[in-house]
């Protein structure tokens, strides 16, 4: 398996700046006045009850939701080329097998690496050619997560990545996220599961956003 690329020390440390971000949905305020700065090598955990706006916030960050007020600024004009976004749904094509799904996703995002090794890393060795329609929800989630074992992007935005994976999968994902951050990747994810110590936490509740655990507002 090829080694994931690391990021040059010459690149700016700041990856993302949000200033006074606000969003409503169905005439209900999700969050207001959200401001924070996220930098290379940081892990940000976004928490909140169902409906608090976690997924909406991630979709704003990656450019899939345009109905908001405030400023969202990434570190470079071509930021989308250096972004890996995994949504709440696995995004797997049922008619394709895991290997075909992974190759298809990599072609769309211009992501390199060894798909066979990535599938083995997430416990899908031996299932590479089984149609996704015949796999469990957890196995489909692992197909999506396998992209985290390919050539590394500068930013990972992950919506509930721990859904439908077993204890071994959780441990492997924890390790991969921590290693990515150590190599300079900014990781932003939604989950009630905390990856480890030093994680910056953003909690959404009652239209407000609170940054804790060392997050800079």
UniProtKB/Swiss-Prot annotation:
Keyword presence, Translocase: yes
Binding site for ATP: 48-55
Record family assignment: Belongs to the ABC transporter superfamily. CcmA exporter (TC 3.A.1.107) family.
Name of the molecule in the record: Cytochrome c biogenesis ATP-binding export protein CcmA
Cysteines engaged in disulfide bonds, as pairs: none
Any one GO MF annotation of this record: ATP hydrolysis activity
Lineage: Bacteria, Pseudomonadati, Pseudomonadota, Gammaproteobacteria, Oceanospirillales
Stored Pfam families: ABC_tran (PF00005)
Membrane-topology descriptor: Peripheral membrane protein
Subcellular location, record wording: Cell inner membrane
Keywords, ordered alphabetically: ATP-binding, Cell inner membrane, Cell membrane, Cytochrome c-type biogenesis, Membrane, Nucleotide-binding, Translocase, Transport
Main localization (coarse): membrane
Gene Ontology BP term (one): cytochrome complex assembly
Catalytic activity: heme b(in) + ATP + H2O = heme b(out) + ADP + phosphate + H(+)
Gene3D superfamilies cross-referenced by the UniProt entry: P-loop containing nucleotide triphosphate hydrolases
Keyword Membrane listed: yes
Documented EC number(s): 7.6.2.5
